[in-house]
């Protein structure tokens, strides 16, 4: 079953965050991560959901998720992301309606 990650960001350094995107995008492509959403103008439905950016990612399964975040090149890119932004993320399993 697919594993999803929802992340919201407060971006403190836009140039730094752009460097992260430039480094991370080829890794997402190489590892076949599906990016369902990447919105830099999200509309919060409640005050605690305010964010400069939101992202929704899909991984084949939990193993794919764990493997992706353990890639050395992604770990290095994530250091740049973390220096440029504050992230809050949640991992969860895809829900499938019973038939």
Spans of model-derived segments:
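Short S/T/G/P-rich N-terminal loop/turn motif that feeds into the first structured element of a domain
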Residues: 1-54, 59-70, 93-99
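C-terminal structural segments of small proteins and small subunits
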Residues: 65-68, 72-90
């Amino acid at each position: 079953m697919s594993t999803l990650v929802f992340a919201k960001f407060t971006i403190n350094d836009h140039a730094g965050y752009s460097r992260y995107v430039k480094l991370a995008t080829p890794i997402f492509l190489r590892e076949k991560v599906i990016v369902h959403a990447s919105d830099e103008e999200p509309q919060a439905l409640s005050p605690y959901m305010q964010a400069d950016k939101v992202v929704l990612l899909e991984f084949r399964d939990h193993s794919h998720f764990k493997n992706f975040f353990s890639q050395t090149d992604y770990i290095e890119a994530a250091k740049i992301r973390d220096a440029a932004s504050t992230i809050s993320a949640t991992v969860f399993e895809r829900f499938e309606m019973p038939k």
